[in-house]
């Protein structure tokens, strides 16, 4: 087995947002409603310390329902990284879907 080949591979951890990193308050899109789940920031620190890429994935059906805009979600994610930067860490990327739970995306 070629060990050098594996040294170049990135490790990644994909985390859901609501209910994993923050308390699920329903249709979260404002920083003032955001509350970290106990241990979430520490878990991200541990992942980063062990050279993992940290990627957040989340379904944001509130966009399709008209409760908020995709820019609101992007702003919240930027705010999350601003808070994490104070802890010396960052989430590498965020991805979200606007689909409703029973929708069949194409």
Could you say what each language-model-derived stretch is?
Residues 1-106:
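HAD-like aspartate-dependent phosphatase fold
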């Amino acid at each position: 087995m070629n060990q050098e080949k594996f040294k170049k591979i990135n490790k990644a951890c994909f985390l859901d947002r609501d209910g994993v990193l923050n308390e699920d308050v329903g249709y979260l899109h404002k920083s003032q409603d955001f509350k970290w789940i106990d241990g979430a920031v520490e878990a991200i620190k541990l992942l980063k310390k062990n050279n993992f890429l940290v990627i957040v994935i989340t379904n944001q059906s509130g966009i399709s329902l008209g409760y908020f805009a995709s820019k609101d979600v992007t702003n919240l994610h930027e705010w999350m990284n601003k808070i994490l930067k104070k802890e010396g860490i960052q989430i590498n990327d965020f991805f979200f879907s606007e689909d409703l739970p029973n929708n069949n995306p194409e």
